[in-house]
Amino acid sequence: ELAKIVREIKPQVVAHLAGQVAMTTSIENPRLDFETNALGTFNVLEALRLHSPETVMIYSSTNKVYVSLEELRYIEIATRYELPDYPFGLDESLPLDGSSPYGCSKLTADQYLRDYHRIYGLRTIVFRHSSMYGGRQFATYDQGWSGWFCLKAFEMADAEAPEFTISGNGKQVRDVLHAEDLVQVYLQAADQA
């Protein structure tokens, strides 16, 4: 079905956003995680290679392909944790590891995009996201945590709402990116590919 659609439409750009995104699911069912993330991406690449090799493919990956952040050196200050070895934040120079079934399945897909560019000349782009938020997000504790946290915080404004647990001690620092901003980055990348 996918090959037929690609053959008929020959899209200019494919933004491959489909995937299994919950860390807990990847641990409970690593086969589903691998088949969805690695094999699913492979299927998109093959459809493009065979039927529309001029299409730009943008892949939504994850920061979970990098070494576990627990391996980095932290300093706890009054309001947050800091990374003295990375005073301006983390970038793509971190070693790749995967460090979980989820990270491994996404890293496998990342590598296939690199190889399909190198070997077959496909125009591939990989973005490794962290925390996303935006409209139509159906957030849960283990997926879309920023939306989940905001929902729980609003519920707490109601004195009858049940308490909820925040993992950690509240000093964690996370970058969040709105989906509309990401779409703009995707469009710019596609224009430059």
List the predicted regions and their residue ranges.
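Conserved Rossmann-fold NAD(P)-dependent oxidoreductase catalytic core, especially the SDR/UDP-sugar
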Residues: 42-100
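NAD(P)-dependent short-chain dehydrogenase/reductase
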Residues: 70-87, 101, 111-190
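Active-site helix of classical SDR
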Residues: 105
